[in-house]
Regions:
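Bacterial lipoprotein signal-peptidase II cleavage site
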Residues: 20-32
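Extracytoplasmic small-molecule ligand-binding "clamshell" domains
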Residues: 53-148
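Acidic, polar ligand-binding/catalytic clefts
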Residues: 124-190
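Periplasmic-binding protein-like
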Residues: 168-176, 251-290, 311-320
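Extended ligand-binding regions for polar small-molecule ligands
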Residues: 47-54, 111, 118, 195, ...
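C-terminal motif of bacterial Sec signal peptides marking the signal peptidase cleavage site
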Residues: 15-19
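A ligand-binding cleft/hinge motif common to bilobed small-molecule-binding domains
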Residues: 135, 151-160, 209-210, 237-270
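Bilobed "Venus flytrap"/periplasmic-binding protein-like clamshell domains
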Residues: 74, 79-81, 101-119, 151-155, ...
């Protein structure tokens, strides 16, 4: 989310990176020569959860069909928001703003390079392109091989594109100004009378409508930047975003703001998770799922998560 106070963003991003790091340095990954064959071998059960044809030979780099031969093209939105994409040294490669996907810094940047590594692609063989959020899961041909951009799995999205197995389980949350009475809310019942806003087409908006169900209709914004501006202008009492984004908003984008709380998934329901986006029926889907399974199995994904994302336990939970 693009900050109106860009002059402060670089310093604050650096502070956040230090606060969320488990010790700094590059996140652990498989060896540079690792291939999808190794990924599948590292997780024998993976083949049962992906397409039956996902064999080691089928996922060897030389057999993969990609947009550009020998390259893995990865899409994400611009600005590339922290904590998913970071610029600890304050320098971003054009055209990227706020965060830089190309440097391997930040949760999703590190994750994307780890997936690429499992598929046999060196960092120099990964090409990043700008893909607006809504476009990533819209029907039609894709200019990317994979898209990594905080896209939550939804059945309706899966009708138009392939969505991978989850790589991060998340909770939605509320950000408010400290001076607003909503800041003391503890339960969903406490939230009913307030006005909420979120970006269009997001699971954050779904949370307002289906979980909070306030008396006033949600205010829908075209982007998170606009939603943040609405919070600052007091058009809304609460901004609903995923929890990692909430940590960034309160630390770097909205002065005197607070995380009111996060929503735990209702008992008996599946937790929300981020998925990699691929073209419908992509030949890479099974191999990407195998790579994700291997990253979970060997501990790489857990290490990346701990390095770049704040502990969920540090935010209060809104009670039913």
């Amino acid at each position: 989310m693009r900050s109106a106070l860009k002059s402060t963003v670089v310093l604050l991003i650096a502070l956040m990176a230090a606060a969320c790091s488990n010790g700094g340095g590059a996140s652990p990954s498989a060896s540079a020569g690792a291939t999808a064959s190794a990924a599948i071998a590292a997780s024998p059960s993976t083949a049962e959860s992906v397409a039956p044809s996902a064999s080691p030979n089928a996922c060897a780099k030389d057999t993969l069909t990609t947009v550009t031969a020998g390259k893995l093209t990865v899409g994400t939105d611009n600005p590339a928001y922290p904590p998913y994409f970071q610029i600890p040294d304050g320098t971003a490669t054009k055209p990227w703003e706020l965060g830089d996907p190309t440097n391997g810094q930040g949760f999703e940047s590190a994750f994307a390079y780890a997936v690429a590594d499992k598929l046999g692609f060196a960092k120099t063989d990964v090409a990043w392109i700008v893909v607006p959020f809504d476009n990533s899961f819209a029907p039609g041909a894709k200019k990317f091989d994979i898209d990594v951009n905080q896209v939550s799995y939804k059945p309706e999205r899966a009708q138009a594109v392939d969505l991978s197995d989850g790589y991060y389980t998340l909770n939605q949350s509320i950000v408010a100004l400290k001076a607003n009475k909503i800041a003391s809310a503890k339960t969903i019942a406490d939230l009913k009378a307030y006005k909420f806003g979120a970006q269009t087409g997001t699971t954050s908006l779904d949370t307002i409508n289906n979980v909070i169900a306030p008396t006033a209709a949600a205010k829908v914004y075209s982007s998170n930047d606009d939603a943040i501006a609405g919070l600052k202008a007091k058009q809304i009492d609460g901004l609903v975003v995923d929890l990692p984004t909430a940590f960034y908003v309160t630390a770097a984008q909205v002065d005197n703001s607070v995380i009111v709380g996060q929503f735990a998934p209702p008992t008996g329901t599946d937790a929300e998770h981020f998925s990699v986006v691929l073209a419908k029926s992509s030949p890479l889907t099974a191999c990407v799922n195998a790579a994700i399974a291997a990253l979970k199995s060997d501990g790489t994904l857990d290490s990346i998560t701990k390095e770049w994302l704040a502990d969920k336990a540090s935010a209060p939970v809104i009670q039913p």
